[in-house]
Amino acid sequence: MAFFPTLFILKEERQYSNMRIWAKEILDNRLIKDMVVTDNSDETRTHKVFNALDEVCHAFDLGKPIWLDSNITDFQVHSKTRFTKDSFIEEIPFDYLEFHVIEED
């Protein structure tokens, strides 16, 4: 009788030591506000992304946007997403908030 070991493949999230995220408010194809958030903590990539979004929303005086399925897919594929008015509960004074990972080490 042959023995075949069972392999378990667990999806581990890679730890990044340095991450920079660029957030931009865009109105009529023009940059209104922008900011770069740098995170050198030992958190996971997901935690760093959420912490950066919290920091951006606080700095721009915005409510936190809702991550729609399209935002999640765009961010997973391109490391970039756009939060439009559909992602915010309150009215926003711009067309969209672009959130883009510009550096990961």
Label each region the model flagged.
Residues 8, 21-22, 83-88:
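Intrinsically disordered, low-complexity boundary segments flanking structured domains
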Residues 14-16, 47, 90-93:
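Short, surface-exposed loop and linker segments with low hydrophobicity and enrichment for Pro/Ser/Thr
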Residues 3-18:
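Short, Lys/Arg-enriched N-terminal segments with co-localized hydrophobic residues
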Residues 9-12, 28-30, 60:
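Non-catalytic effector/regulatory segments
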Residues 31-59:
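Short, flexible N-terminal segments of the mature chain
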Residues 52-105:
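Acidic, low-complexity intrinsically disordered segments
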Residues 5-9, 26, 55:
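Compositionally biased non-globular segments, especially hydrophobic aliphatic-rich helices
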Residues 16-36:
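Short, extreme N-terminal segment that most often corresponds to the first beta-strand
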